[in-house]
Amino acid sequence: MQRILTRGEIETLDRTSIVRLIFPAADTFATRAKRLRELAPDNPIADYLRLIAKLADAQQQVFSQEHAIPAIDERQLAQAQAHGMPPFNNRNITRDKRWREQLAAIVELLLADGSLAEPIRTLLSSLRTDIQQQPELIEQQAEALLNVPAEHPEVKKIEAARAPFIMAALQVYWSQLVSTLESKQLPAHTPFGLCPCCGSQPVSSTVMLGGPKEQIRYATCSLCSSQWHIVRVVCTHCEDTKQMAYHTLEEGRAGIKAESCDHCQHYRKIFYLDKEQFAEAFADDLASLPLDILMGEAQFYRANNNPYLWQLAE
């Protein structure tokens, strides 16, 4: 039987032998779509999970297509190294129009699905029109999704119903960008709690199973899907180590918990592959909304949104 490491043992693990970063796999979005479909039956938001599975299918098709990805700017890499910052920081790199082309392709793939509900079809048709006729509006909405805190007045530019589709294209775009990187090109140290590749926050974290990653925790980037090592006894939001707690639903799955911090009053989900072998950072987070409700009732706040379900601050 697998032995669970104690807090002290976790803290003393040899970090030099730990794989720091895992880049997104070639089938990242296909794996996500498959998991969403597995989780849909008997789920309170089953229809939504199936819709997002279709969206992930479209992401995979676009992600797998040949695209002219610009060569890595050596000056950009040098600056990232010098300042300890992610090389493809979503806050300061200029997006090219390719991401809007990818958004258009995702929309067309979804509209080709005859089983799509009419309200979704109407939403996507409107989005397609704006991509063609108002690209500056789409850019403004993307900028707000990437960079505007939930409490900021500019958040009004975010259309919650459109957000998952716009974010889907941004995910594909950034996943392709970081796929051109090598681990050695990243700074040795980058800001805590942010993706070393693109500077985004994690959607959740996962405690791995098997091989050299056994019982090692990795946070999964909400934008580029890269995974990076974070010690298990640390709040992924504020880095506190002393006021952590773990929450589960009474009838929930044992491999899914909410990791909360009394210091900052925030939480993120954490998945344990020894108990939930096929857990996927985005899909299982989305499919466990009752746990989010429990955490809200306990006066904790989500550290950040799942990009497939945008919730505006009230």
State where each predicted segment sits.
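Charged, low-complexity interaction segments
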Residues: 1-31, 38-79, 263, 267, ...
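Short N-terminal signal/transit or membrane-insertion segments
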Residues: 2-10, 16-20, 126-139, 196-204
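Residue-identity detector for threonine
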Residues: 6, 12, 16, 28-31, ...
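N-terminal alpha-helical interaction blocks
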Residues: 17-182
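Short N-terminal helix-initiation segments at or just after the protein's N-terminus
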Residues: 136-139, 161-169, 201-209, 296-300, ...
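Cys/His-clustered metal-coordination modules, chiefly Zn-binding fingers
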Residues: 176-294
